[in-house]
Swiss-Prot record:
Example of a GO MF term: ATP hydrolysis activity
Record keywords: ATP-binding, Differentiation, Meiosis, Nucleotide-binding, Oogenesis, Spermatogenesis
PROSITE patterns recorded: AAA (PS00674)
Protein name (database record): Pachytene checkpoint protein 2 homolog
Annotated binding of ATP, by residue: 171-178
Family the UniProt entry places it in: Belongs to the AAA ATPase family. PCH2 subfamily.
Organism: Danio rerio
Annotated gene: trip13
CDD domains: RecA-like_Pch2-like (cd19508)
Gene3D superfamilies: P-loop containing nucleotide triphosphate hydrolases
């Protein structure tokens, strides 16, 4: 059976989807239909592949000239994927390398209310893949937003089945909530590129709404959302709106009610909630919000969110995978040399964590990961850099030497963390 015949095998049997992301070079002038044909031919020759496999070198002149990479994306489950039993969803995209523009509210004051990116953006490329959480978190978020758009397309009556197109990610600082929002928007702009001609990402600077223009903040909120509404009015555009640290908006209302903040704060928050209610009615908008302090969020806001996902500090397993991806990158760049194979946690488990020449370095990494529990995702990503900067005796290091340096860096990070806690 030709792999390009990829819808149904028998009547009534629906195959599971597998997503193929095709990153086309920015200078390419090739038609999408031609790119698709050549990619299907490539997949037909490699019908069984590793999940998350990425082709970057091709034996096909057309693909070499026009395509940066072809990736089997976001597959969970078995390591090997049989493409012949899947429905192939091919997503062809080019990255936008424009810098973000700003949404200014007051020309004379140059008050920047938000930053605006065209997606998929070079700046967000690889963010989704770099974020490692407990299994299921990223998939659930992706499925949720995809379903909201699917229900909207099918004109499902929202009075009978309610959904708000609002996502709230909450948890301690440094766990990657803002990056996850950016990665999610980037991923969906690629997934839905056949449905929407283009996607935009608006990041609202909530702190600017509580600036020296405080007395006018209610009006400024309205003005900002009017500008966002103009983006949403283009029905060929998918618009993501990010409100970071939403507690700074919603906490203001309870503080004002308690008499500790001016009543203008209530007007600002009420204005934000009213404007969100207006824009979320549109099928082509998704509202993403983050909070570092869950208990300070206004209940009226929490009730508006369909998904309230806690993003906590990484577990030892997630930390192992974070470090593993960092070490792979350093071996690729020959900062760690020679390249040595590290065994995954799953493979260590099947070997009952027995020490041998094959597992020794991986077990060392596992111990470092366990020692790192409690550090934020932001801190964890800095450990390899600190290891080299502070404890690297030479510019190029062996894997064993680098793991020793990482151990020192983790110990230093934990000592600094303890010192800060004691100072408070």
């Amino acid at each position: 059976m030709d792999i390009s015949d990829h819808h149904m095998t028998d009547v009534g049997i629906i195959r599971p989807d597998v997503h193929i992301e095709v990153h086309v070079k920015s200078q390419s002038t090739a038609k999408r239909s031609d790119v698709r044909t050549h990619v299907l031919s490539l997949l037909d020759r490699h019908s069984t592949v590793l999940r998350s496999f990425k082709w970057m070198d091709f034996d096909n002149e057309f693909l070499t000239k026009n395509v940066e990479s072809v990736t089997i994306a976001d597959v969970t489950g078995p390591k090997l994927v049989d493409l012949k039993v899947h429905n192939l969803c091919i997503h062809i995209f080019t990255l936008n390398d424009d810098s973000p523009s700003t949404l200014n509210l007051e020309e004379e004051e140059e008050l920047s209310a938000a930053n605006l990116w065209l997606l998929p953006a070079v700046e967000f490329h690889g963010v989704w893949e770099s974020l490692i959480y407990e299994e299921g978190i990223k998939t659930q978020l992706l499925d949720y937003v995809s379903t909201t758009i699917f229900f909207s397309d099918k004109n499902v009556d929202s009075n009978l089945i309610a959904w708000n197109r609002v996502v709230l990610l909450h948890g301690p600082p440094g766990t990657g909530k803002t990056s996850l929002c950016k990665g999610l928007a980037q991923k969906l702009s690629i997934r839905l590129s056949d449905r929407y001609a283009h996607s935009q990402f608006v990041e609202i600077n909530s702190h600017s709404l509580f600036s020296k223009w405080f007395s006018e903040s209610g009006k400024l909120v309205t003005k900002m959302f009017q500008k966002i509404q103009e983006l949403i009015d283009d029905k060929d555009a998918l618009v993501f709106v990010l409100i970071d640290e939403v507690e700074s908006l919603t906490a203001a209302r309870s503080a004002a009610q308690a008499g500790t903040e001016p009543s203008d704060a209530i007007r600002v928050v009420n204005s934000v909630l009213t404007q969100l209610d207006q824009i979320k009615r549109h099928p082509n908008v998704v509202i993403l919000t983050t909070s570092n302090v869950t208990e300070k969020i206004d209940l009226a806001f929490v009730d508006r969110a369909d998904i309230k996902q806690y993003i906590g500090p990484p577990s030892a397993k997630a930390i192992f995978n974070i470090y593993l991806s960092s070490l792979e990158e350093l071996m690729k760049r020959q900062i760690i040399y020679p390249r040595q194979q590290l065994v995954s946690l799953e493979e260590l488990e099947t070997m009952n964590f027995m020490e041998s020449d094959v597992t020794r370095l991986s077990l060392c990494l596992m111990n470092i990961s366990q020692r790192s529990v409690g550090l934020s995702g932001r801190a964890l990503r800095k450990i390899p850099f600190l290891a080299h900067a502070l404890y690297g005796k030479t510019s190029t290091m062996t894997l064993k030497g680098f793991l020793t340096a990482m151990e020192h860096a983790v110990n230093k990070q934990r000592q600094e963390q303890a010192s800060l806690v004691n100072c408070v």
